[in-house]
């Protein structure tokens, strides 16, 4: 099986799972906000400092959406790579000669996938570590 076929096969599953994880993350944020401001919500809305913070929040929505898109892409890529690795067939001694050319041709592509996966792990960890380790 080619890598592009396997990538398209796991793309929908990975995308659905990534959206589900992001939905849970956003739901957790909303629950924390309502827990903190539930009893004082009217006072919160009419407070001048709170209105200033809400305006700043709406100005930074583009940054938030970019953050969500980056996290979604990271989760989707990791699930696709995991699905590709799990679905690859093992090479027996009889079929080794037949698969040898295919393996050599795609070796560079597989190495590039591993490098991209490790780089995305590294950069996403350091870019979003304050979101991942926040005590709610």
UniProtKB/Swiss-Prot annotation:
Listed A to Z, the keywords are: Membrane, Transmembrane, Transmembrane helix
Q: How does it sit in the membrane?
A: Single-pass membrane protein
Give the location in the cell. Membrane
- This protein's record includes keyword Membrane: yes
> Which Pfam family name is an example for this entry?
DUF5426
Q: Which domain of life is it from?
A: Bacteria
GO cellular component term of the entry, any? membrane
Location, primary (coarse class): membrane
TM segments? 14-34
Q: What is this protein called?
A: Uncharacterized protein MG441
Lineage, please? Bacteria, Bacillati, Mycoplasmatota, Mycoplasmoidales, Mycoplasmoidaceae
